[in-house]
């Protein structure tokens, strides 16, 4: 399918062929008929992308500070590479479209194939021939609402939410400052609600257009005098600021024309240097509106389909969409007069020449249109023929996110005996980009395409944590060797299913516990190779803060941070000691509403009496180095600092080794390739993979028990038994 993409490195907006996305549970596949170009949000993205690195840095000093911290922690070269990897990722543009449902994922009751819908949301309602959209961002369309009107639904909801925040009443006087698309929708919504409306703009053409829609409208120069006449010198009850300008004038003007104790709502991107004197004297209320309404930026609402109770939240973003569509159906919200340009998707780049001013012509509503007669659906884009040359590993990859692009695929690309066959991502876009960048034969949006491809003998699973176990089982059943990024599973039921499959399988599997393969880790292990006493290993992790709403913090999706990432450090200690833990005790600092059991101290015991301690901490400073390992055993001490420096002490003799940070990604893949080529054992024993994963589960459970007297016995505890899992 065709999709408009923004290159964040060079600023070019281009139309590319990408695999058609596939709907997962709670999502619908929509064949798009029309999509609206946002002259505000999308122009801002394009203009940012077009700037050079210095220009980008000036606009985002917060990101510059993060890069400086990362450079101090990890070195300049890895930091620059990480920055370019982020800029290299294409961005999908658009957030408001309309079309027809052509396929449904599971749990989509209330929707049907063939249904006409409006679509909303950045990353979902994008400028592409097909969109995959979650249920709460879909709005059914009445027969008398055309697709081109419905493509305005998302923008209409922004205006609607801003208007609702002002708590309007019938008969109140409402001023709308700024008569762009948002303002022209807002004046119609306010009029439909029974308010007396006046629009204000600096552009006489916008003023004339507003007047043609049935409201009084004036130029900025006449705003104060006209406001007094319009309100009989009382001032406006409500002022909606819909302007798009860095100037502070709209905020200042709003205060001048508002009545005493009026409500002012800003929906546009304007200067917010609020003049205290007049706002204080009039006791004005000021609200900065956030997007489409309640539910916005809440993944449980937008992506997981959980609605808010009507009695508690009357106007969610979804119900705002419905309200906008209803006004369109009743003829009270007109969009046709607002459209100045139509472009077919093939010429979408020309639309951005208009909205960025490269093409000097006035514009307002810019629509992209899509051929409805065309119905060529392809989940696969081919770049080249599959090579007939023999390779030990013919690789298919599931997942094309930042980890794949910045870390694993560069490591894989450097290994000779790996041929890159196919790569998949659910949306298709990132698979297409990564497939072309790294030299895969094809890109797809279908996991099954990769798993069932007879040309592929090895599958790398780099998807969301909750999908790992199921994909591992499917790939093993298909006779593939499997590399899966950690964690292996997010719960004991998944882990038991993987364990059973491994017992009945001839293919090899390994997990992305790369740290044990790092060069300095191998030196550290060699230093203790002949030890005869139990070890004490302390692993301190300055993990850094992650917001509570991040997907990794969700136990059902990411597993939480201890299962999702803490397993790395349990595995490293397991590697050094050479056996899986037999008990785990864990304690967490109080969360205090900021954390989610991610300031944790875990104590692990091992069969030979060794003890491992993992301090996983989210409450530190990210500019400080992330990881430090200290090992005490048999009169020897070793300190590993962030996989950059190893210091060993024995009999008073100190030795220090320094090198560029290397956490072992390439070495692990090389070990896996060698095992496949030679038909040997997996690089990490299965009992350790299972044991480490169980230990991460036990640590989370121990935090819940929070009793210093009771550790979790890894062998006998019912959580890790087959009967409990069943």
Model region roles, listed by residue range:
Residues 268-285, 289, 295, 488-508:
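Rossmann-fold NAD(P)-binding glycine/threonine-rich loop
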Residues 295-312, 507-508, 515-593, 706:
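Predominantly a Rossmann-like dinucleotide-binding segment in NAD(P)-dependent oxidoreductases
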Residues 259-260, 469-513, 719:
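Beta-strand-loop-alpha-helix segment that lines the small-molecule cofactor/substrate pocket
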Residues 21-36, 45-122, 677:
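Glycine-rich beta-strand-centered segment in the early N-terminal region that forms part
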Residues 353, 358-372, 377, 564, ...:
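Contiguous beta-strand/loop segments that form the cofactor/metal-binding neighborhood of enzyme cores
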Residues 354-361, 368-369, 374-386, 458, ...:
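C-terminal helix-rich "cap/oligomerization" subdomain common to oxidoreductases
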């Amino acid at each position: 399918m065709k999709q408009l993409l923004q290159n964040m490195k060079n600023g070019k907006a281009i139309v590319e062929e990408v695999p058609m996305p596939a709907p997962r549970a709670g999502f619908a596949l929509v064949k798009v008929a029309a999509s609206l170009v946002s002259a505000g949000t999308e122009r801002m993205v394009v203009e940012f992308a077009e700037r050079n690195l210095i220009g980008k840095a000036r606009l985002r000093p917060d990101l510059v500070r993060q890069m400086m911290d990362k450079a101090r922690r990890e070195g300049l070269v890895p930091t620059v590479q990480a920055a370019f990897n982020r800029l290299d990722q294409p961005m999908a543009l658009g957030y408001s479209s309309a079309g027809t449902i052509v396929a449904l994922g599971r749990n989509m009751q209330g929707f049907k194939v063939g249904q006409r819908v409006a679509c909303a949301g950045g990353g979902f309602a994008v400028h592409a021939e097909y969109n995959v959209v979650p249920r709460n961002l879909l709005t059914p369309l009445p027969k008398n609402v055309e697709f081109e009107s419905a493509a305005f639904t998302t923008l209409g909801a922004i205006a609607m939410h801003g208007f609702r925040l002002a708590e309007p009443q019938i008969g109140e006087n409402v001023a709308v400052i700024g008569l762009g698309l948002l303002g022209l929708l807002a004046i119609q919504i306010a009029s439909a609600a029974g308010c007396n409306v006046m629009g204000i703009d600096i552009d006489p053409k916008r003023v004339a257009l507003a007047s043609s829609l049935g409201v009084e409208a004036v130029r900025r120069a006449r705003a104060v005098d006209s406001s007094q006449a319009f309100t009989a010198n009382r001032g406006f009850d409500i002022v909606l600021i819909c302007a798009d300008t860095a100037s502070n004038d709209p905020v200042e003007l709003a205060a001048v024309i508002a009545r005493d104790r009026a409500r002012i709502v800003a929906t546009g991107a304007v200067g917010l240097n609020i003049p205290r004197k007049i706002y204080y004297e009039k006791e004005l209320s000021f609200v900065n509106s956030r997007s489409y309404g309640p539910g916005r930026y809440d993944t449980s609402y937008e992506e997981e389909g959980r609605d808010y109770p009507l009695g508690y939240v009357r106007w969610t973003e979804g119900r705002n969409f419905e309200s906008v569509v209803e006004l369109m159906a009743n003829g009270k919200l007109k969009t046709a007069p607002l459209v100045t340009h139509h472009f077919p998707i093939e010429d979408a780049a020309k639309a951005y020449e208009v909205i960025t001013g490269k093409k000097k012509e006035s514009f307002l509503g810019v629509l992209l249109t899509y051929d409805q007669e065309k119905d060529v659906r392809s989940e696969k884009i081919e770049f080249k023929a599959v090579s007939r040359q023999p390779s030990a590993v013919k690789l298919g990859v599931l997942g094309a996110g930042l980890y794949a692009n910045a870390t694993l695929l560069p490591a894989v690309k450097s290994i000779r005996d790996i041929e890159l066959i196919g790569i998949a991502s659910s949306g298709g876009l990132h698979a297409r980009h990564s497939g072309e960048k790294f030299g895969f034969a094809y890109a797809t949006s279908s996991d099954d395409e990769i798993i069932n491809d007879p040309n592929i003998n090895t599958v790398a699973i780099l998807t969301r944590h909750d999908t790992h176990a199921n994909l591992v089982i499917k790939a093993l059943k298909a006779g593939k060797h499997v590399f899966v990024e950690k964690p292996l599973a997010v719960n004991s039921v998944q882990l038991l299913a993987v364990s059973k499959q491994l017992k009945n399988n001839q293919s090899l599997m390994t997990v992305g516990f790369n740290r044990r393969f790092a060069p300095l880790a191998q030196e550290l292990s060699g230093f203790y190779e002949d030890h005869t006493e139990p070890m004490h290993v302390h692993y301190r992790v300055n993990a850094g803060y992650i917001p509570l709403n991040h997907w990794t913090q969700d136990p059902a999706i990411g597993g939480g941070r201890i299962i999702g990432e803490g397993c790395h450090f349990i595995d490293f200690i397991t590697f050094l000691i050479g056996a899986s833990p037999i008990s785990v005790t864990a304690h967490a600092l109080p969360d205090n509403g900021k954390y989610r059991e991610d300031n944790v101290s875990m104590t692990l015991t091992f069969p030979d009496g060794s003890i491992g301690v993992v301090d996983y901490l989210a409450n530190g400073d990210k500019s400080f180095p992330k990881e430090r390992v200290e090992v005490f055993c048999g009169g020897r001490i070793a300190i590993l600092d962030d996989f950059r420096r190893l210091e060993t002490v024995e009999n008073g003799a100190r030795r220090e080794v320094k090198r560029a940070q290397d956490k072992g990604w390439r070495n692990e893949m090389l070990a896996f390739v060698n095992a496949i080529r030679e038909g040997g054992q997996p690089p990490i024993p299965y009992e350790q993979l299972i044991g480490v994963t169980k230990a991460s589960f036990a640590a989370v459970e121990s935090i819940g028990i929070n009793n210093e007297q009771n550790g979790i016995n890894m062998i006998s505890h019912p959580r890790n038994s087959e009967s409990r899992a069943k």
